[in-house]
Amino acid sequence: MTSTDPEQLWAPANPESTQSAKLAAHVSQKYGVQLSTYEDFWRWSCANRGDFWSEVWDWEGVIGDKGPAPYVDESARPKDNPKWFPNARLNWAENQLRNAAAHPADVAIIDTCEHTSDFKPAPREVSQKELVGLVAQAQAGMKAAGVQKGHRVAYWGGNRLEAAVTLLATTSLGAIFSSAAADFGVDGVIERLEQIKPHLLVVSNGCVYNQKHHPLLPLLPRLFTSLSHPPANTVIINHLPDELDDKVSVSQFLEGWHDGHTKLHRWADFVNHPAGVPTYERIGFNDPIWILFSSGTTGKPKAIVHRCGGMLIDALREHHIQGDISRGDVFFQYTTTGWMMYQYLIAGLATGATVLLYDGSPLKDPATCWNLIDAHGVSIFGTSAKYIEMVSKVYPDVGKKHALARLRQILSTGSPLAADLFDYVYANIKQDLLLGSVSGGTDICSVFAGRCTALPVYRGEIQCRQLGFYLDSTSSDAHEIPGELIVREAFPIEPVGFWPLPREYLPDGQNIAQADIDAAQARFLDSYFKDDAGNWYHGDFVKITRSRAGNSGGLVFLGRSDGVLNPQGIRFGPMDIYSVLENPAFAARGIEETLVVGLLVDGGNDEKVILFVKMYDGKALDDECLKLIKTSIRSARSARHVPARIVQVSDIPMTLTGKKIEVPIRKVINGAPVAAINPATLRNPACLQEYVGLGEAMRAEEGVLVPLLQ
Ligand SMILES: CC(=O)CC(=O)O
């Protein structure tokens, strides 16, 4: 330990009893190697990729046929996107439901949602056996509707039981799932469905958020008439009772809507088939399983297709081997169906744990998640860094108000977790738990920098690089020096490509133009690969620390790599600023949200750091607050980090998944047209125009006469 090492905040009581340590011992013995530390194991897993992932398959008892070795071409670069387990056959849903046979009465899913004064459904507990039956029924409905391997099934609605059943039934047939959250605007949904042309749409009649009913049915006519190929069948789920609100009556909608293209069904009718056990169509490891859309802000959303086998074995690596989640655990990840954390959550079923679903606002009543944790004995709670920050401001004394008796891990993602919030969690929520800041994202539908139960937690750092991923920064072995996050070796959760995939994956692809397939694959290559070595570029700016306690190096994420700031040659990420300001002291001063970007000056040779600040209603950015911001940044970082301008704005633009958009706003304030930003990808596109005006004014004041970015 050196004086610059961050404080160790937690350490496992019994690291050798963790799954990762046991697997390392098994590998050491089997391969005659000595893997004494996590770092040894991580290095071995990166150097022996076929063997490592094959060991994960065996250790996890994956149901299916692994096929013979070799399991991957070890010489292939990430850019070659090699096929993994080329002869394997497996089914994702079969593996998620595999615990039903031995433990039919275990609770598989607890389905909960936000209440209103006139809508208070009790939590639904669904046993393993019941879940299998529900999937069999939904599968029968899908078969009757003609759904087959490779067809797309889309879901639009809340994170409720029927969404999970739809996902499981879709994948049981080898069909491809895609989902949009209930709060996605209809334009965003049109843009997604138009790209993937689903055969079947399952849609909720509405949901509750912020104690209000949000009906979706009124949006359906616009959706259907806008799609060039409306789904042949649409199934409507009564998540809100008909009588709640006359705008949401499913009966009226079913009677009133006849467009002749899509056939409407009630969920209850669609699944009206005998329960029993579904059939499982085993497909190839590299066959598509679901399509996620990236929250890119220019152009159409990227339709990222993930591979079946990778999604299965990597989730087991993540949840069981590195997270020690297993039967008896209750896993609650706060998510909507529009975020990749949805798949991350449902994949917890394969461990035998109970998965808790909650649909609604996590903060309208800030006690909500903590009440669920107490009421249902949640042991693993996943949330976002933003949520933890908000809780620290609006409901700080969680640990005094809640027992949190079984809680042993809190996972945080979505954006980097500031060091102060590590302190907050350990001081105000619970001391004896693993606080895992984790990072990955839509592009890989998983986590590749994250938690490991065998390792300590250091303040402000992600614990480790996950097994099987040769993560590095472009500053390479010069650890502690920030650089771009890259993956140096191929990995099995690399997406198959963007939709539409090459024809070998398209059973019904005869109507897809080759030019569209080629354009999608070219966009895929362009999105992630930019050097001759064929490394994967993830788009993050990161610092990987020296290894401590054998942890393979901790990671500090510093913002999107293309949002890197560089005033007077000092490179730093927006997170360096956010981590100072995301602090209850600033919330108390009225700061709600901030965004940092660079304004190019000196012909583009230099830039000035601009901090946009949104204040809570009725609060103004006064001189005292400005002074506090500057002095805090100066003392926490350096004088070079102090923004050249601090500007109050009415809103900070956010993607549908709640991410700030530094890169497009940087372009806008430097003169690029706002039309390049796709408004359907934002929660609050109306605020963009304000940034156009601010950009013009700032450029005029800085004497920038010609816009420097297009
Ligand atoms: C795991 C993640 O990285 C989640 C996200 O930020 O989208």
Regions found by a protein language model. Give the residues of each.
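Conserved AMP-binding/adenylate-forming core of the ANL superfamily
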Residues: 39-44, 93, 109-168, 185-190, ...
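Conserved AMP-binding A3 loop
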Residues: 121-129, 280-282, 289-313
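AMP-binding/adenylate-forming catalytic core of the ANL superfamily
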Residues: 155, 180-206, 220, 374, ...
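Adenylate-forming
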Residues: 158, 200-219, 241, 336, ...
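Structural core segment of the AMP-binding/adenylate-forming
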Residues: 172-267, 384-385, 390
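Conserved C-terminal "lid"/linker of ANL adenylate-forming enzymes
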Residues: 233, 595-601, 610-612, 630-710
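Conserved AMP-binding/adenylation subdomain of ANL enzymes
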Residues: 310-330, 338-379, 394-395
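Conserved AMP-binding/adenylate-forming
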Residues: 321, 408-410, 417-554, 562-564, ...
